[in-house]
From Swiss-Prot:
Name of the protein in question: Inactive cap-specific mRNA (nucleoside-2'-O-)-methyltransferase 1B
PANTHER family: CAP-SPECIFIC MRNA (NUCLEOSIDE-2'-O-)-METHYLTRANSFERASE 1 (PTHR16121:SF0), CAP-SPECIFIC MRNA (NUCLEOSIDE-2'-O-)-METHYLTRANSFERASE 1-RELATED (PTHR16121)
Example of a GO cellular component annotation carried by this entry: cytoplasm
Organism superkingdom: Eukaryota
Organism per entry: Caenorhabditis briggsae
Domain RrmJ-type SAM-dependent 2'-O-MTase: start-end pairs: 184-413
GO MF, one annotated term: mRNA (nucleoside-2'-O-)-methyltransferase activity
Family annotation (InterPro entries): G_patch_dom, mRNA_Cap_2O-Ribose_MeTrfase, RNA_MeTrfase_FtsJ_dom, RrmJ-type_MeTrfase, SAM-dependent_MTases_sf
Length: 846
């Protein structure tokens, strides 16, 4: 991150210095007091804590039968010296404290002017003005009145004679929105995003808020079970740039919930990197970090920008992200008043990156500070060219005495963005060239001042924005001064504003949890029992209208062993092998907590002509069925719905680059984790399609069959068939309505049930039906098979060569009929054709 540290209140920092170390010197950052390490779970409890536990105390709850007691320690009353005696009380009437906020969208640019500017930027770089650098801002009155600017700068200078401790404590007591803090998130950046998301009508997260169903994903009432109402929606992609430790991203992953979003992160590597291990509101496994070609996360490096653009394109199938957020700043210690001048290249590069990675119609949120210079205002103007609409706003969660504000850009226009992107890349390379030469020159303008001034409506709006914020900042600087002198003063509205704002932003009013949850949804059952092997008889029926082949779906397996149960907990991943659970290194198995899967751990195969080579990468974790996906219990859904959800889950976990970096400094290392993917599902009617993805090779006289999934290949070891309806039911075909139905000799009163009623009547088999075979289930299945009903919840069709006979991949693929009573592809197709023929006679109706 480019760390914010406020010396009253323009943000300053020291790059590559941790917030905690720097806090001792300049303790005024907009985020600094919220990023605190969680207590170690192994930390010994004090006697007082043990006594409180015996009384029934739990973190975040009050004592008492109904937990009605206070939750916070009683505040200590203090007074330092004689400060506060004889000082005047602050006049609250000078402030405007509200819960709701009104955002103002700037007037959209005229379409003719938009085209003219793009045409101009394509032709040449004459608008790029290079001249001697400027190090003062006092005379920048083109976009703000001289008096407003002077008053603000003078208000800042008053604090040069005050201690940092007094200023910080004054801010804590004076800012009416201070107690909002970071809520249950990593830091205050998350709450800024929550604040902005709500007041901009959810254009950041793109939540469908019509009937408030989105709140089912993140219930406001603690203890309410969350529901994934967006399971069927497309994956939401976002990028977080210059934004360590990651508050923006933690909010977005929390708001989208479950596995509905995938984030990309780009920030300075080092101590101020993303603190993914501190994410508690969501899983950091849905977030992929990247540091550019230079591996330093410098957003101003031209090569890094190009590599980030390429990565996002690869990771989003060439579409780009729906949303980009940027939150950059760097150290301007001692030069706070010219922060805008010193930050100009950072401004430029953050806006440039948005044009590189945001998709058509996508949105962009970026924090800025002062915008008084022609360079900054020119950037804002160019954003109007590239987006449908833009807005400038300072939210409640941005401390009122600093100059921070946000630009919100809605609806990227890709054609205009391409033109402006290339122009800004040329500007950035020019700035890089001047920097490398230690030149005293600088790029001072991006477009002529007279072009900007000719847009009278824009000029009016930018001046009004600057003057309103300058006045508000001046008022709160004066309030800080008053509170610093009178240490007995507190803003009386802080508590009420916190509660009301959280409610308005639809954020639960709760505390940040301390650590992971090892709980899981795993039910107890006997894991030792195995389902019968696949046979042709499972596709046969004595009832003419039955279509047993439609009762099954299958996936190919690439591992020699049968599929294995995998469980992700709060701090570990376990897989069931050889009769017991084994732990996998969680750095290599990136599976979020509260996840239960059935997986095929397969080695990827590379081919060179007829040669076969096993990939050196860790084996793939292929999902062949799913029970719980990061807390989303899909176990009772139909099999195909479970697999569709698992496909989205795997896409959210997908790493664009195979290697990731863990640790930093001399402890940093690159590792290659297991990739997670979802197996492709087929019906038996789709055997031809499945066959088209098979490759038959000979190696050392042995036939080997590979199957393709996307751009990967695996050795075909077996097929797993899953029955999609419960064991009691049989599937038939209705000639009259041309749809499938189910019936059961065990439930004759139920009659025949058409497909559109299966969900309501709970006909579909569950995950547990096809994975766990209890002794009772095994006995029932055996009895049914003895009576000719060969309905098996799941079964494995092994393709491995048989040591005693010639049965194996070659016979399975090429033999025209069953071989030694064992299934082949031709035999299955013949059985399907025979079954279809039996449904044709006109005298069979139900």
């Amino acid at each position: 991150m480019y760390v914010f540290v406020d010396r009253l209140s323009d943000s300053v920092s020291i790059p590559f210095v941790s917030k905690r170390a720097y806090r001792k010197r300049v303790n005024l950052d907009d985020d600094e007091d919220d990023f605190v390490d969680d207590p170690s779970p192994t930390e010994q409890k004090t006697k007082a804590e043990k006594k409180m536990e015996r009384m029934g105390y739990k973190a975040g709850e009050g004592l008492g039968k109904n937990k009605q007691g206070i939750q916070e320690p009683i505040a200590i009353s203090f007074r330092e010296g004689k400060a506060g005696l004889g000082h005047e009380q602050w006049d609250d009437s000078t402030e405007n404290k509200t819960v709701e906020e009104t955002v103002i969208w700037m007037t959209n640019i005229d379409e003719g002017i938009r085209r003219e500017i793009c045409d101009k930027l394509i032709k040449d770089d004459q608008w790029m003005v290079v001249r001697k650098e400027k190090k003062v801002i006092d005379d920048e009155t083109k976009f703000c009145s001289e008096k407003k600017l002077k008053d603000m700068l003078e208000a800042k200078n008053v604090f040069d004679s005050m201690s940092e401790k007094d200023i910080r404590e004054a801010r804590t007591r004076a800012n009416p929105y201070e107690t909002i803090g970071s809520a249950f998130f990593l830091n205050r950046s998350a709450m800024k995003t929550a604040n902005m998301d709500k007041i901009y009508d959810w254009i950041l997260s793109r939540e469908n808020t019509g009937n408030n169903s989105f709140l089912l994903k993140n219930p406001l009432q603690e203890g309410t079970t969350a529901e994934n109402v967006d399971r069927h929606e497309d994956l939401f992609y976002f990028a977080d740039v210059c934004a360590g430790p990651g508050g923006f991203s933690e909010y977005m992953l929390w708001r989208k919930a479950f596995y509905n979003a995938k984030g990309f992160g780009f920030t300075l590597a080092g101590k101020d990197d993303f603190k993914l291990q501190k994410f508690t509101a969501s899983s950091a496994y849905f977030f992929e970090t990247f540091y550019g070609t230079k591996k330093n996360g410098d957003v101003m490096d031209p090569e890094n920008i190009d590599s980030l653009e390429k990565l996002i394109s690869e990771g989003t199938d060439g579409q780009g992200v729906h949303l980009m957020m940027a939150d950059g700043a760097f150290s301007v210690q001692g030069q706070e008043n010219i922060q805008e001048i010193l930050s100009k290249r950072l401004y430029l590069c953050q806006l440039l990156v948005s044009l590189c990675i945001v998709r058509e119609g996508g949105n962009f949120l970026c924090n800025l500070f002062d915008i008084f210079t022609p360079f900054s205002v020119g950037l804002i103007y160019l954003m109007r060219v590239c987006y449908d609409s833009i807005s400038l706003h300072k939210p409640h969660t941005s401390r009122p005495a600093n100059s921070e504000r946000f630009v919100v850009c809605k609806g990227l226009r890709i054609e205009c963005a391409r033109v402006v992107k290339e122009y800004l890349k040329r500007v950035n390379r020019k700035l890089d060239e001047l920097k490398n030469k230690n030149s005293k020159d600088d790029v001072m303008e991006l477009m002529p001042l007279d072009v900007i001034k000719s847009d009278e409506q824009f000029m009016k709006e930018i001046i009004e924005h600057n003057e309103v914020l300058a006045h508000r900042q001046t008022v709160y600087l004066q309030k800080y001064k008053s509170f610093a002198k009178n240490q007995g003063q507190f803003d009386k509205d802080q508590g009420n504003l916190r509660d009301e704002c959280l409610k308005y932003w639809q954020v639960p009013n709760k505390q940040r949890p301390r650590g992971g949850d090892r709980g899981s949804h795993l039910r107890r059952g006997r894991m030792g029992n195995k389902f019968p092997e696949f046979s042709i008889s499972m596709l046969q029926s004595k009832i003419p209208l039955n279509i047993p082949y439609e009762e099954y779906r299958f996936v190919a397996l690439g591992a020699a062993s049968d599929p294995q149960l995998l469980i992700g907990t709060g701090d570990a991943v376990f897989i069931y092998r050889h009769g017991h659970f084994e732990q996998i290194d969680r750095d290599y198995a990136r599976i979020p907590e509260n996840t239960i899967l059935l997986v095929d751990c397969a080695e990827e195969v590379k081919t060179d002509g007829s040669k076969i080579r096993i990939s050196s990468d860790p084996h793939m974790i292929r999902i062949v069925d799913a029970a719980v996906l990061y807390g989303d219990n899909v176990s009772q859904l139909p099999y195909e719905a479970r697999m569709k959800a698992a496909q989205k889950f795997a896409l959210a976990l997908k790493l664009t680059k195979k290697t990731i970096q863990i640790g930093w400094g001399f402890r940093a290392k690159d590792i290659t984790p297991h990739q997670v993917c979802c197996a492709q599902t087929y019906s038996l009617k789709e055997l031809d399609e499945f066959q088209s993805n098979l490759i038959e090779l000979k190696q050392r006289g042995e036939v080997i069959v590979l199957f393709k999934e996307g751009d990967r290949q695996f050795k075909t070891q077996s097929l797993r068939l899953t029955r999609i309806i419960k064991q009691d039911w049989q599937m038939g075909w209705s000639k009259s309505q041309q749809v499938p139905y189910v019936h059961s000799p065990l439930h004759q009163k139920e009659g025949s049930i058409l497909e559109d009623q299966w969900k309501k009547r709970e006909i579909h088999s569950s995950f547990w039906d096809s994975v766990i075979l209890t002794n009772k289930d095994k006995q029932k299945m055996t009895e049914m098979m003895q009576h000719g009903h060969n309905a098996v919840p799941s079964t494995i069709w092994s393709w491995k060569p048989c040591m005693r006979t010639e049965y194996g991949p070659y016979k399975i693929m090429n033999h025209p009929e069953a071989f030694d009573g064992k299934p082949t592809i031709s035999a299955i197709k013949s059985q399907i054709a025979e079954t279809d023929l039996s449904t044709q006679p006109s005298n069979y109706f139900y």
